Structure formats: C-alpha cells, structure tokens
C-alpha cells in the first residue's frame, strides 16, 4: 500500500495476537472495549484491508467541491501572499528558513484549525454513519468471527466406514 504515510499492515499479522511484551496469544474477545491492545488489533485489520486508504480517497475526491475547502484555500493563498509581501528578497537566504517562517505564522494565526474543522464537518461527517461505520463494523465482525473460530478446537473427524450404533429398542 502506498498511501504516502501511515500505511502498511499496522500489526495485522501474527504479532496482533500477542502482547507487545512478547507474551502468549491474546484473545481479542477477552479484552474490554477501549483497551489499547484491542484498538491496535482492530486498526491493524482496517489498515491491512486498505480501508483507511479507501476512506482517504473517498474524502479527497469530495473535498475540493465543498465551500469550506474553497474558503480555506482562498484564505491560505491570501495569507501566503501577505506573508511573502512582507519578506525582503535576499538571494542567499535559505528557502527552508522562509518555509519555516511561513509555517510558524500559519500555526500561530490559528486560522487553519477552524477551517479544517469545517471541512471535516462538510466532508467526513456525512459519510461517517452511512459509509464508514458499516464498513468498519463489517470488518470488525469478520475479524471477531475468525478469532472465535480459531479459538474453538476443531472436532475430530468421524471415522469413515463405521456404521453408527443402532438405537436401542427398549420393549419394557
């Protein structure tokens, strides 16, 4: 998975069934809701199936059509232009210093946080209950069923070629 950050299996392999201290297998069903190990196991399952990448692509395809994104983009353009207008051009100046100064100004202004929250409200929130949650619940259900099946020992196969014992006929 090449998602540009945070991809990978995320511990969905055999390590997801062991404690981080190298202990024995963990039964996810025995962990309480909210347990960090359970959360890590579930997140690993979601990552290994590409669900986060799918959500990211879905949201990214939708984001630039939203007014909050367009508004934030315009404000960012204006902020950068204003910041650069205040800078004195110095050819030997390090571009990284200019980038860092701009980044610090954006963070200190606090404008981007509110804009990102509005974008999230317009893009992510509508998809949360109707698209994302059902997919997450389905994967969790499949994972827990597989864990339960793996925890139940298989019944020995019935011997072939033997007739089952005849039912006793009590004539009393």
Curated annotation (Swiss-Prot):
Keywords: Cell cycle, Cell division, Centromere, Chromosome, Cytoplasm, Cytoskeleton, Kinetochore, Mitosis. GO terms for cellular component: centrosome; cytoplasm; kinetochore. Residues 1-35, 151-172 are annotated as: Disordered. GO terms for biological process: cell division. Its main location: cytoplasm. Residues 154-172 have a biased composition (Pro residues). Pfam families: COMPASS-Shg1. Residues 1-13 have a biased composition (Gly residues). Belongs to the BOD1 family. May play a role in proper chromosome biorientation through the detection or correction of syntelic attachments in mitotic spindles. This is Biorientation of chromosomes in cell division protein 1-like 2.
């Amino acid at each position: 998975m090449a998602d540009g950050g945070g991809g990978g299996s995320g511990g969905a392999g055999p390590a997801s069934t062991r404690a981080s201290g190298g202990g024995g297998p963990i039964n996810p069903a025995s962990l309480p809701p909210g347990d960090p190990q359970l959360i890590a196991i579930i997140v690993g399952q979601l990552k290994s199936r590409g669900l986060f990448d799918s959500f990211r692509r879905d949201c990214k395809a939708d984001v630039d059509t939203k007014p909050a994104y367009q508004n934030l983009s315009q404000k960012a353009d204006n902020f950068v232009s204003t910041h650069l207008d205040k800078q004195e051009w110095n050819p030997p100046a390090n571009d990284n210093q200019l980038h860092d100064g701009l980044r610090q100004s954006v963070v200190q202004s606090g404008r981007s946080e509110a804009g990102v929250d509005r974008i999230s409200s317009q893009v992510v929130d509508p998809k949360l209950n109707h698209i994302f949650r059902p997919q997450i619940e389905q994967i969790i259900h499949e994972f827990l069923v597989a864990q339960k099946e793996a925890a139940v020992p298989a019944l020995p196969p019935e011997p072939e070629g033997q007739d089952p014992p005849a039912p006793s006929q009590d004539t009393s």
